[in-house]
Amino acid sequence: MIITAIDTNIYDQPEFVEGRDVIGVRFEDLVLDKRIQRVALPGGEELGLRLNHGHPILREGDVLKADDKTVFVVEIIPTDVLVITPSDIHQMGFVAHSLGNRHLPAQFSKPGELTEKAAMIVQYDHTVVSFLDEHGIEYQRTELVPPIPFRHSGHTH
């Protein structure tokens, strides 16, 4: 079966799953924006994704396939990340500048979203841990599903 569009998300339309079993199909963060891919459903059946150009990134709860009894939905595998919580604006600037020079994709959270303080979120990297430890910058290693997949962007000097 070839899927060309995602029309429903169970979090947008929870009534869609009433009376049906919901089965997650696991995706890594790195493939959520790939338009063309093959995925294996639990039980061995394969689905092909051939989404149109400009299709939004796959997100948690997108319905891949449904019948009268079962709904197969996107389930995003949590990513190993560092949640960095600098003590002040100076330390935040230092961290952002230093990690930015490494061209690491980063995301940011507001106070109260992930931690009490604003945070910078990067994918786990042992060299980043060494840098943070060396400079006494507070961080926590955890797994989470980021709201937007981490992506390396093109870069030139």
UniProtKB/Swiss-Prot annotation:
It holds the Pfam family UreE_C. Induction: By urea and nitrogen starvation. Disulfide bonds: none annotated. InterPro entries: UreE, UreE_C_dom, UreE_N, UreE_N_sf. The keyword Cell division does not apply. Its main location: cytoplasm. Keywords: Chaperone, Cytoplasm, Nickel, Nickel insertion. It is found in: Cytoplasm. One of its GO terms (biological process) is protein-containing complex assembly. One of its GO terms (molecular function) is nickel cation binding. GO terms for cellular component: cytoplasm. HAMAP family: UreE. Belongs to the UreE family. Involved in urease metallocenter assembly. Binds nickel. Probably functions as a nickel donor during metallocenter assembly. This is Urease accessory protein UreE. It comes from Corynebacterium glutamicum (strain ATCC 13032 / DSM 20300 / JCM 1318 / BCRC 11384 / CCUG 27702 / LMG 3730 / NBRC 12168 / NCIMB 10025 / NRRL B-2784 / 534).
